[in-house]
Amino acid sequence: MTSFKVFTISAVALAVAGLTGCSTTSTKAADVTASVRNSLDQAGLKDVSVSQDRDKGVVTLGGHVPADADKTQAASIAQSFAGTQVVANEIAVVMTGAESDSKKVNAALDKAIEGNLDVAMVKAKLRDVKYAVNNHVVTLTGTVNSPANRKLAETTAAAVADVQQVVNELQVKGQKATSMN
């Protein structure tokens, strides 16, 4: 009987330990989209869009505003809810009455940034790094071999003229997106 009790207790302990080991914790960031949207609306910034990638920990602002101060205010509002998440501020400043001209200038500037970024990435031997440029914000994607190459890609992109922000979504085991303003 004693060996049966020991066996039963051992089996229960093993089952509990196994179940405890199976518990998972979510690495997703908190959903802040509705809170940011509500605060932007209250601030009169209704033309600003909000999206979030909870897996990567990135909150992205888009759309257009008439002044730099509005763009800065939108970023501050988003950051107040985002916590440790990166806020990618892709808002275009488009002056009222000159929307088409402003959009053309922004598109031309983004194209110039892409060209300069192509050259910079080749010089840094980072040809495999993928990126997108939207309203002077560079988003790096893909994979790199080391944390050093991840950092090199970020600093290389940040050094390109007219880049306002770099969102680094490059994957290196165990790391999340970062931002460099």
Predicted regions and their residues:
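N-terminal targeting leaders
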Residues: T2-N181
